């Protein structure tokens, strides 16, 4: 193996297979762009983003790790969210949860 080399199987790789998902319409009501990373607890995003926060609790963007979605001022877009995995304990972010989901 060469350092940094990736060995992957042939075929398609399905991200987040078998996890619960939800699609939400999200509007940036602010005057500045807002970018949300792949593993940010979507429930705790910038308050200028308007969407059904209750449906976003325990969810993150259903996108590849290390990527992000940008919301321009006045823009509304649909995003798919996926359930957080693991112990489903959330600390940090905006401090809205600080414990079990």
UniProtKB/Swiss-Prot annotation:
SUPFAM superfamilies hit by this protein: Urease, beta-subunit
Catalytic activity: urea + 2 H2O + H(+) = hydrogencarbonate + 2 NH4(+)
GO cellular component term of the entry, any: urease complex
EC number(s) given by UniProt: 3.5.1.5
Recorded metabolic or biological pathway in which this protein acts: Nitrogen metabolism; urea degradation; CO(2) and NH(3) from urea (urease route): step 1/1
Keywords in alphabetical order: Cytoplasm, Hydrolase
A biological-process GO annotation: urea catabolic process
Enzyme class: hydrolase
Record's subcellular location: Cytoplasm
A GO term, aspect molecular function: urease activity
Annotated InterPro entries: Urease_beta-like, Urease_betasu_sf, Urease_subunit
Subunit-level organization: Heterotrimer of UreA (gamma), UreB (beta) and UreC (alpha) subunits. Three heterotrimers associate to form the active enzyme.
Family of this protein: Belongs to the urease beta subunit family.
Protein name as annotated: Urease subunit beta
Organism: Rhodopseudomonas palustris (strain HaA2)
Gene name linked to the record: ureB
């Amino acid at each position: 193996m060469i350092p940094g080399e990736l060995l992957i199987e042939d075929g398609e790789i399905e991200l987040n297979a078998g996890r619960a998902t939800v699609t939400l319409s999200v509007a940036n009501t602010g005057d500045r762009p807002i970018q949300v990373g792949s593993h940010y607890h979507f429930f705790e995003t910038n308050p200028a983003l308007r969407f059904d926060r209750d449906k976003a609790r325990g969810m993150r963007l259903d996108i590849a790790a290390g990527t992000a979605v940008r919301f321009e001022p006045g823009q509304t877009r649909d995003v798919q969210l996926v359930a957080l995995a693991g112990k489903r304990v959330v600390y940090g972010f905006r401090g809205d949860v600080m414990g079990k989901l």
